[in-house]
Amino acid sequence: METPLPQELPPVTLILGGARSGKTAHAEALVLGSGLQPVYLATAQALDAEMAERIRRHRLQRAQGWLTVEEPLELPHAVADAAGANRSVLVDCLTLWLTNLLLAGRDVEAAGDQLSAHLADLPGPVVLVSNEVGLGVVPMGELSRTFVDHAGRLHQRLAAAADRVRFVAAGLPLDLKAPGGRR
């Protein structure tokens, strides 16, 4: 079997999708297909047994060769530190990062601005994964509504800064924005 040729990634790719939509698997395939050193920047925290098990399963599913960095709060700096000309960074996921920021009482909008600003100067490609949470009904609880509002604004900000934006549903990617323009 022939080894596929590396596929060049644009500087910034944003991948959105629902829970269990296949967005992370798609992002991993893009990063591995780049031929660069894959870096997995995880934002999840093992705050309960179910999340600890989920993190363990994710680690086992990834092929060997991934460098894993865990950073639940200081994502802009972690992305900048992990990026390199010979590396492709996958950030999974932005909505968990937002949750961490909200629960820590951080300024979510400022953190989103900081992340967006860091993306322009990275020496290698980054693939950002996030849950699209704005497709359902307006949540009843104030914290849930605040979270959905922050996620929507962050996604819009990052989509504007990204070279490629994809939406994944049922494992199928749909380009919302392709390198060089809109689709």
Predicted regions and their residues:
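Catalytic phosphate/metal-binding cores of nucleic-acid and nucleotide-processing enzymes, i.e., regions
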Residues: 5-9, 85
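Short, well-ordered coil/turn elements that cap or connect secondary structure elements
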Residues: 35, 61-63, 84, 121-123, ...
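Short, well-ordered beta-strand core segments
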Residues: 38, 89, 164-167
